[in-house]
Amino acid sequence: MFEKQYDVIVVGAGHAGSEAAAAAANMGSKTLLITMNLQNIAQMSCNPAMGGIAKGQIVREIDAMGGYSGIVSDTSAIQFKMLNKSKGPAMWSPRVQSDRMRFAEDWRLKLEGTPNLDFYQEMVAGLIIENDKVIGVRTSLGLEVFAKSVVCTNGTFLNGLIHIGDKQFGGGRAGERAATGITKDLIEVGFEAGRMKTGTPPRVDGRSLDYSKMTEQPGDDIPGKFSYSDETKPLSKQRSCHMTYTSNEVHDILKEGFDRSPMFNGRIQSIGPRYCPSIEDKINRFADKDRHQLFVEPEGWNTVEVYVNGFSTSLPEDVQFKALRSVAGFENVKFFRPGYAIEYDYFPPTQLKHTLETKLVEGLYFAGQINGTTGYEEAACQGMMAGINAALKVQEKDEFILKRNEAYIGVLIDDLITKGTEEPYRMFTSRAEYRTLLRQDNADFRLTERSYNLGLASEKRMRKMEEKKDKSLKFVQYLKDLSVVPEEANPVLEKRNSSPMKQSDKVFKVFSRPQITMEDVKNFSGVEEFISENELNEEMIEQTEIQVKYSGYIEKEKNNADKLNRLEDMKIPKNFDYSNIKSMSYEAREKLKKVQPATVSQASRISGVSPNDISVLLVYMGR
């Protein structure tokens, strides 16, 4: 069978659980991954894609930390796009369309090749907790397995309830049963629980679609990739997606089913994701819009199954079908399966520490949708961080926390712990106040050394990052030292409608002009030779351009981050008594008592805590 004592047990093998198990095992902890179905490891339950706005940055951060999501996203990709390329580098976000079946298979194979990792297929029905400390899990068959740390990554399975029109039934995902027992155990020891909702669109037969009535959405001409490692290569061929629109006719058909919609008849009370609303929610909330975009996404290289992005719904199946048949290109559509909504239990994340360990039960960690987030990438990064900290706790080493100025992962976890969430939380670039520092191109600079010190990133990765960093810095310095005369620069400046130079200047300064590109700079004497002699690749050249163009913004954000970190270093004593600080607002006292922030900086980010409250706190702490 398997051993009965582990360092770390991970409950659930979705995106969070898979990264948690990989991190803990790769750090040397004897790890057991328990899932209800070993054939469904790392399933893409919703859209067949990884990355996107802010999410792509997270995948690159996971990769820089030695996680598997970036590598698997590359090996299973069918299309690559760098989103927001017309904006500044802080907004660039990589995204891949994925082969759903290959994604899950590649994840399974990566995990099977990971040392210190065992697998078991069973439902975990309870947690074994003694003296406010988790010591193991109990399965539905009554088997008890013990561990020093447990990571719960239950996804949408905790008391999951699926809705299609006026039909509802228990399930954690289409065709899979819900998980029961854990919520009851956690409430009994004092946890607060809530319910959330998410939804998914119909899957259809691509052979029944008329793509000539849609707009093709190809991948990038020169595709990139997620992983910084040499383990993966950019795509040599790609599959296109397509775009079409709903219409007033489609909306009218959908409205016919509103009286049977669980969203509108009160059957679903939970809050769904604000930024991924159902089609019925969209036409209800945005009644002035006569059409909505639909993205038609292939599910893989060889399958005919297609995902209808933008048509998430829990309306009756007959209404879904009739409405889709009125969409341009879908006149003869055949369904593979209808869309549905699912309600599930979650635990407000203010009950966690920044390590993702629960405050109530020692050694118990939560990651993913159990914390109120939505999205594969958000789940995966939490899983990785929970797995790292679960392993560190077992090894009696210092905890690992990423700050808001160090990673989007740090922003996400800090938001959850200090602000909580009452609706499914997803990441956006706008949530990160230091997004110029947290770009997708420099995640390796920010995180690889930290990961290497944890024992996750390999020596090879570390050397590769150092070479990229050294060579790009050397190129920046070369451009600062190199002068260019007006006779050489002005023809280039004139072509770009940039004002001419009157005297010699440094290439760095000329390059700083917004109109001037790296291709222009290569025309100046010595630049091409420097690139060739120093064997600079495209990544190093791009890094140099960003450092030159955005040096002012980067410096400003670094200074702001340094100020924040001074507050981050001001620790608040554990179990600090806020009730005696009468000059602080009542709301602030209540919020601080509930969240119990570890630092003054965290306290300042809690909703309802004003700058004046922080000043009072600092005085009270004798600062």
Swiss-Prot record:
Its main location: cytoplasm. NAD-binding protein involved in the addition of a carboxymethylaminomethyl (cmnm) group at the wobble position (U34) of certain tRNAs, forming tRNA-cmnm(5)s(2)U34. NCBIfam families: mnmG_gidA (TIGR00136). The keyword Membrane does not apply. Homodimer. Heterotetramer of two MnmE and two MnmG subunits. HAMAP family: MnmG_GidA. Pfam families: GIDA (PF01134), GIDA_C_1st (PF21680), SAM_GIDA_C (PF13932). GO terms for biological process: tRNA methylation; tRNA wobble uridine modification. This is tRNA uridine 5-carboxymethylaminomethyl modification enzyme MnmG. Belongs to the MnmG family.
